[in-house]
């Protein structure tokens, strides 16, 4: 009887993936209603850490890369960063009021020139790894690459919502979706660390252009 009851609460790997994705989105949405700054808006990141570790994915196994994987990581990161960065540089001023967008970031996160640079470094380094660890390392194998990339894009839409017009935020999600597909393919071919390096380089491009456009640097 005890085994039967326990089995009722045991989810299949696919179900665990969807449950984790929904929980992550729920926490991301809740960040808009919690007045705890970075802590409240960053609760969904705990989901990114917990579920892969609970699934037995060991961090130390992810830090393996060969020369081929490094070359692919750097090439794909520069390629994607250059394309996405160019699109943002030329299109964002036409879809968003840059002054209002900057005021939105400052109001939500209380940025100064110093703190926004620190935040950008954390996003490029640590946040990009958490996203790769969760989406590519955990969710890809449980929900499939298209679903994983869709949730990845939707998470960015939820987090960015309210900072700019809805069309601008949705367009950002449309850019993020193919990036998620690409990093999944890099991970399948070369491993998770390669996907992370590619993601990190892309974020450096995008954050640098964003800081420039918004007048932080």
PLM feature segments, named:
Residues 29-36, 90-96, 157-163:
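Juxtamembrane "helix-exit" motif on the non-cytosolic side of transmembrane helices
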Residues 11-60, 105, 109:
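Alpha-helical transmembrane segments in multi-pass membrane proteins
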Residues 26-31, 48, 52, 80-88, ...:
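Alpha-helical transmembrane segments of multipass membrane proteins
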Residues 116-217:
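Transmembrane helix-loop-helix hairpins at the membrane interface
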Residues 15-23, 40, 44, 72-76, ...:
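Alpha-helical transmembrane segments of integral membrane proteins
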Residues 1-11:
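Short, Lys/Arg-rich, polar N-terminal cytosolic tail immediately upstream
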Residues 62-127, 216:
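Juxtamembrane helix-loop-helix connectors linking adjacent transmembrane helices
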Residues 33, 55-58, 86-94, 153, ...:
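Hydrophobic membrane-targeting alpha-helices
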